């Protein structure tokens, strides 16, 4: 193995090579993961170059995206996907929409202009902070965002407190939705579910 100092030198050389080879990269961040899995929520993020976030734009909206926040990797296709989701939601401006697994609130904020109110729920607290910032920088005042494990957040009590959704938009992680979440969605009886 390498010493910590040697490892540091190699890391800097690699990052500098990436930065020099791809000058179009405006922000370059890295994480050191010595675990046997690829989760990063419990790891520190280091900025090598640029800012600790990027911005994406669609339909005049700006979205701040941090390193621990989920965002579709293909921005152009993300935009097409969000337009289709919005169309499937059939919004008229009067609906209460729940955006489950909202990430940085991109879909929630994207559909907010066609809804009465949008509530976004996400597991990653940093992503929810980005979602709130995204609503603020876009002048959106009809979104609410909550951080926590979906099965603990989306309960019958939550729905009783915040209202029965007319539409649920859900983009769960690969593992899918916990059965408790599915049960609460069935309890909520939304007119439409966009999955």
Regions of interest found by a model, annotated:
Residues 12-195:
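Rossmann-like S-adenosyl-L-methionine
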């Amino acid at each position: 193995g390498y010493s910590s100092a040697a490892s540091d030198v190699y890391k800097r050389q690699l990052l500098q090579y990436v930065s020099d080879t791809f000058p179009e990269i405006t922000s370059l961040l890295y994480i050191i993961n010595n675990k046997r899995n690829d989760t990063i929520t419990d790891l520190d993020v280091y900025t090598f170059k640029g800012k600790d976030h990027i911005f994406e734009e669609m339909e005049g909206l700006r979205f701040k995206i941090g390193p621990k926040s989920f965002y579709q990797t293909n921005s152009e296709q993300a935009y097409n996907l969000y337009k289709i989701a919005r169309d499937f939601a059939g919004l008229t401006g009067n609906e209460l929409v729940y955006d489950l697994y909202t990430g940085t609130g991109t879909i929630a904020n994207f559909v907010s202009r066609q809804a009465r109110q949008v509530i976004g729920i996400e597991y990653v607290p940093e992503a929810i902070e980005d979602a709130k910032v995204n609503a603020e920088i876009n002048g959106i005042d009809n979104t609410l965002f909550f951080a926590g494990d979906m099965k603990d957040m989306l309960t019958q009590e939550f729905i009783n407190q915040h209202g029965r959704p007319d539409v649920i938009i859900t983009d769960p992680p690969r593992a899918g939705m916990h059965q408790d979440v599915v049960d609460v969605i069935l309890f909520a009886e939304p007119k439409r579910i966009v999955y």
